[in-house]
Each structure stands twice: as C-alpha cells, then as structure tokens.
A protein has these predicted regions:
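A short beta-alpha structural unit
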Residues: 23-28, 52-67, 90-92, 96
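Short, low-order "capping/linker" segments at domain edges
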Residues: 62-80
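Short amphipathic alpha-helices in soluble, non-transmembrane regions
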Residues: 35-44
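C-terminal catalytic subdomain
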Residues: 11-36
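Zn-dependent metallopeptidase/amidohydrolase metal-coordination segment
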Residues: 1, 6, 10-18, 83-154
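Flexible, glycine/charged-enriched surface loops at secondary-structure junctions
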Residues: 48-54, 157
C-alpha cells in the first residue's frame, strides 16, 4: 500500500492518491475472473465505486486427478528412485498450469521432480548442484529423475 509523501523525512500532507497491490489466492472451484468480479463487488458494496482495479495477470486454478496417468507415473518414479512422497493438492504458489489443463488442450499437468532447493523467486533462491549426501539429490540426479519419469510414463497405460 502506497499513499502520500514517500520521500525522505516526514510531511503532513493529504495524499492525492493511494495504490494497493494485491495478490489474490483462489479457493477450489473459483476462477480468476470470478475473483476479480468479487473484488469489484466488495469495493462497490462498501462505497468505493471510485477505486480503479487494474488486473496485471493471473491464472485459473489447476487440478489433476490423483489417479491420472501423470500422477501415477510421478508416484511410480518416486517409488522406483526410493523417494518418500506426499501429495500436496493445493500450493500457495502460482503457475500457468490451467493453460494445459483447461480447454482446448485439457491434459493433466502437475509439479514433479527430485532434487534439493529452496527460496523460489527470493534473493537467496538456490538449487543443489552436486550433493555429497547420498540421500539428497543434486542437479544430475534431478535430471536423471526426469528421464526415468519419461520411461515410467511411457510404460503406464
């Protein structure tokens, strides 16, 4: 939220405008367009009809059935590589998966991979290139994991 004087020191002036940047997260069965309409309706209901809303991006939700060939192949690959798994049906992050899962393409899409990294999109983001711990995968192991996944995917009907 930015409003009023933002330079050095302080000034007691009334702001001519205020700007708020929002990051909306969707709940199951909600679309980006629906979230935008609900935001507009909420502002209007509370007397803020003069507030301008500029949408700068966003994606519809992505969901893939647990029993889909894609997810079964991912789980089989993890098992073959000796990786303990857990399914996370909803992520806090965003990605344009709906480009693939919605018409006209309508194919399953999901996140997958082995390897260790953290801090996605942060200044301290990292991915382990070479691991000295046999229980922690580095870049080579991650790459081979993707190759193994393709073989498993081809074998599963």
């Amino acid at each position: 939220l930015v409003a009023g004087y933002t330079g050095p020191g302080g000034k007691t002036i009334l702001p001519g405008k205020a700007v708020a940047k929002l990051d909306l997260r969707l709940v199951p069965n909600q679309t980006r367009a629906e979230a935008e309409k609900k935001l507009r309706a909420h502002l209007d209901k509370h007397g803020f009809t003069d507030v301008e809303v500029n949408v700068s991006g966003g994606y519809d939700p992505t969901e893939v059935a647990e029993d889909s060939r894609l997810v079964r192949s991912e789980l089989a690959t993890y098992k073959k590589l000796g990786v303990t798994t857990s399914l996370n049906p909803r992520m806090a992050g965003s990605w344009p998966g709906s480009t693939f899962t919605s018409p006209p393409v309508s194919i399953p899409a999901a996140h997958f991979g082995i390897g260790h990294g953290s801090g996605a999109h942060a200044p301290d983001e990292y991915f382990l290139i070479d691991s000295t711990n046999p229980k922690v995968a580095g870049l080579v192991d991650a790459t081979m994991g993707f190759a193994e996944f393709l073989y498993v995917l081809a074998a599963i009907k």
